Amino acid sequence: MFLKAAVLTLALVAITGTRAEVTSDQVANVVWDYFTQLSNNAKEAVEQFQKTDVTQQLSTLFQDKLGDASTYADGVHNKLVPFVVQLSGHLAQETERVKEEIKKELEDLRDRMMPHANKVTQTFGENMQKLQEHLKPYAVDLQDQINTQTQEMKLQLTPYIQRMQTTIKENVDNLHTSMMPLATNLKDKFNRNMEELKGHLTPRANELKATIDQNLEDLRRSLAPLTVGVQEKLNHQMEGLAFQMKKNAEELQTKVSAKIDQLQKNLAPLVEDVQSKVKGNTEGLQKSLEDLNRQLEQQVEEFRRTVEPMGEMFNKALVQQLEQFRQQLGPNSGEVESHLSFLEKSLREKVNSFMSTLEKKGSPDQPQALPLPEQAQEQAQEQAQEQVQPKPLES
């Protein structure tokens, strides 16, 4: 299912070679964004796509998303263009086919569960309550750690900055000798505090995923007696739900890590500036310390205010996804786009599998040749025989 999409993924992975700085998630994100934009209005997009400079589009796309890590090997664009043009012609048809398959699967589940509507509602309600109870400690812990670590950072750095300001006044005639050790120690303290912040605040994504798995397994067992004859379809739908919920866990970790990196990026130049000003005059150093002290308070408070709600927002998002799943199984589900989660799940699995193959076979200095569409399936089969067997894309 959606083989052409998978092949494009493999090709784009091959473009980057096996450079260590390019991860499978980065590649999958770029490819998935590309597919999503194209499939929003597939027919119109395909027609427009074939009229424009495909090479420039993809080059710009990868440059924006991956930066220097996406530098292409010479001549790769010429191989990519015919591949993508052929792919685009099949995209709309493939997407619609998968959409219909998932729609039929949901209809079969609704028909089977309809006589037990009250029990289904009760089961979901109980499961949502348990999910909230299981997730609450993570949100509380994240909030506590944010408050503790940001407060500790200020307690470590603010008094030290004030000590440096006092030392300046007492050592005007011997500024460099007296202040250089303090400035170096300030930088060490700052770096150490940032590392501790990362260590304590990075959410435990694997633990969150395990909680999600356990919660959904409990739900599956509770619904099993109500889905006799269609349990495989229920299992399949819940795989898609699990993928989306776990994706939220990964995104939470990414967001928190990004905020920590941004805080460090904002404050590090100010710390460096203090060191550089030690070689200058008293007035310049004093101003640099004042700027750092002021920005430390502002930036840390902004960080705390932004990150603190993320745990609770994550919990609400998971409960909402569970509620949306319940509605999909109900009589008034309306139009849904649940097929997209299956396409994305399969796409990412394919990227991960192929990246693993490249790491085992390829060299960072020797990018893999780009397969054309008609060659892709044969090449994938050859690779599978060499230890890695990618899973077939699911429908």
Curated annotation (Swiss-Prot):
It is found in: Secreted. Residues 366-395 have a biased composition (Low complexity). One of its GO terms (biological process) is leukocyte cell-cell adhesion. Keywords: Chylomicron, HDL, Lipid transport, Repeat, Secreted, Signal, Transport. The keyword tRNA-binding does not apply. Homodimer. Belongs to the apolipoprotein A1/A4/E family. This is Apolipoprotein A-IV. It comes from Mus musculus. The lineage of its organism: Eukaryota, Metazoa, Chordata, Craniata, Vertebrata.
